[in-house]
Amino acid sequence: MDLYEYQGKQFFADYGIPVPRGVVVSSVEETPDLPNGGVVKTQVLTGGRGKAGGVAVCQSSAEVQDAVHRLLGTVIKGHAARRLLVEERIEIEHEYYMSIFINRKNQVPSLMFSDQGGMNIESVAKENIKIVDINPLLGIYGYMIRELLSQFQIEHKDQITEIITKAYRLFKEKKLQLLEINPLVQTKNGEIVALDSKITMDDW
């Protein structure tokens, strides 16, 4: 079972993974007042929203209102957006990619990480994507994550290590099939924030 982005981010917040402040709206009247602008995101169970026009970055409260009016009911790849997630705007310094998933080859969890996240993750070269299998009996340790991250020239390794540790705990405790953060961003203030969420739960 796939979760909507806002549902996945609630899980993230519950487990201490930083996410942008935001509210879910289903009508224009529910739109929050954001003088500094914000991001309006359609809540549909499909990928590629950004490229399909389902995400609007707004510079003012008026633009947020217009985006909510325009995007409510929008159909993205056959899915109608009945809800929108309206969030604060984050100043992005760098985008990363991370996911934890069940590796079908050996039926164990695997951690995937790249220093090149965002909408074009599918086109990232293989040498910029690293994968490590996780022994489900032992779990994941900080040194394993740091060893993985050491293959990239990135800052804030300790923050990212902490987020991945929390993400694995969420993955294990909720018996997830997939947990993806794309992008996981470094802000201009040096914070690491989960800007999106994709979660698939076990139907059983």
Show where each model-derived region lies.
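A long amphipathic alpha-helix within ATP-dependent nucleotide-binding catalytic cores
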Residues: 141-184
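Glycine/small-residue-rich loop that forms an oxyanion/phosphate-binding "nest" at active or ligand-binding sites
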Residues: 67, 72-77
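ATP-grasp fold ATP-binding core
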Residues: 6-8, 12, 35-50, 78-92, ...
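Hydrophobic alpha-helical hairpins/lids featuring a short glycine-rich hinge
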Residues: 78-131
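Terminal amphipathic helices with adjacent charged low-complexity linkers/tails
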Residues: 185-204
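Glycine-rich phosphate-binding loop of ATP-grasp-fold ATP-dependent ligases
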Residues: 20-22, 40-67, 97, 119-126, ...
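Preference for protein termini
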Residues: 1-28, 32, 36-37, 82-84, ...
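ATP-dependent carboxylate/phosphate-activation module, predominantly the ATP-grasp catalytic core
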Residues: 53, 110-155, 198-204
